[in-house]
Amino acid sequence: MKILVLNCGSSSIKYKLYDMDDNSVLAAGGVERIGLDEAFVKVTLPNGEKKKIMHDMPDHREGVNFVFSLLTDPEIGAIKSLDEIDAVGHRIVQGGDLFEKSVIVDKSVEDGIESLCDLAPVHNAGHLKGLRAVDKLMPDVPQVCVFDNAFHSTMPDYAYLYAIPYELYEKYHVRRYGFHGTSHRYVSQRVCEYLGRDINTQRIITCHIGNGASVSAVKFGKCVDTSMGLTPLAGVMMGSRSGDIDPSAVTFLMDKLGKKPQEMADFLNKQSGVLGITGISSDMREIESAAAEGNERAALALKMYSYRIKKYIGAYAAAMGGVDIIVWTAGVGENQKGIRLDSCSGLEFLGVKMDEQANMTRGVEAVISAPDSKVTVCVIPTDEELMIAKDTMQLLQDK
């Protein structure tokens, strides 16, 4: 069975084609700048070589169509015909409380995603464009939606509700939803496979730390809490997002800066976090380099960043009555040893003991805690696309 996984943003499409017989990636790439000048596709060829192809793409339908043409291209394609694609799986950022698991797409699913656009206007609108483009080009191929927040749907109400009048939750569905759920689900399952443990007996804290970052508490295979909230702005400090901030600080700044609500949201999402503190970059690699060269604000940002992750680890250990495994994943979590070490330092009282040599690892599955550490700390590279492909295959087989 061959499954195409799509992640459609407002002006981009990331794709991977899987052969589910052995979970191998047959093709991968990304379309950028849809609807803008100088649109292009970055393709990873079967031999591993990367190629950039310029192509005019006024809308998502043309973007999807061009992806299809690349997949079947006689020279660089991975398949001979689109008939070889058995299904298409989509990443959907916001499923609200309408979708608690992955679903096969029909009209009601489309309508549901559209109804949630006010919770994730940029993301969900892009996802819908991708869904509809595939439907126009391959109407007979089943499509599946895998929701970013579905894994977090097992949170108890006392964890996901905000302390505001209850009728606002009932009327507007204002609550903690969480994000990166497909990644948290993948690494929590994969780490137990890797360690040979039963997930139903483990208390796991998963740290998805990339430019966007979130921490989740996974108790006996189910998410019981997560750091992101109604939107991906809440929680730990991120590349350009503030993370948790006193709401009164927001209204105070709106008054001082003369910003409207949407302008303030953009400010907290795009000009804050590590970028806001350093004034240099949202890229943690650049911040580590700047700190090493003596930049004091870069050093401050690193301390703030790790400190906030550490606080969430401690909080979630308390929420679960202890912790057995801590997992690091995503761009920063998989590759930056300093962030991992600083975030775990001071957690010896929980039973965390790091192995500094093992912690040198980058981007591969590894145990990075000491042999005598009561808590096992691991790096597990995430694979959200494979999780989406597996969900898609499972739903088709269960039909």
What annotation goes with each model-predicted range?
Residues 9, 90-93, 209, 323, ...:
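Glycine-rich beta-strand-to-loop/alpha-helix junction loops that act as flexible
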Residues 151-255:
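Glycine-rich phosphate-binding loop of actin/hexokinase-like ATP-binding domains
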Residues 70-85, 191-198, 313-324:
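Phosphate/pyrophosphate-binding loops at sites that engage ATP/ADP/AMP, CoA/4′-phosphopantetheine
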Residues 266, 273-277, 284-319:
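Adenine-nucleotide phosphate-binding core of ATP-dependent small-molecule kinases
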Residues 90, 121-125, 142-147, 153, ...:
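General beta-strand structural signal in soluble alpha/beta enzymes
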Residues 337, 341-384:
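Conserved phosphate-binding/catalytic loops in two-lobed NTP-binding clefts
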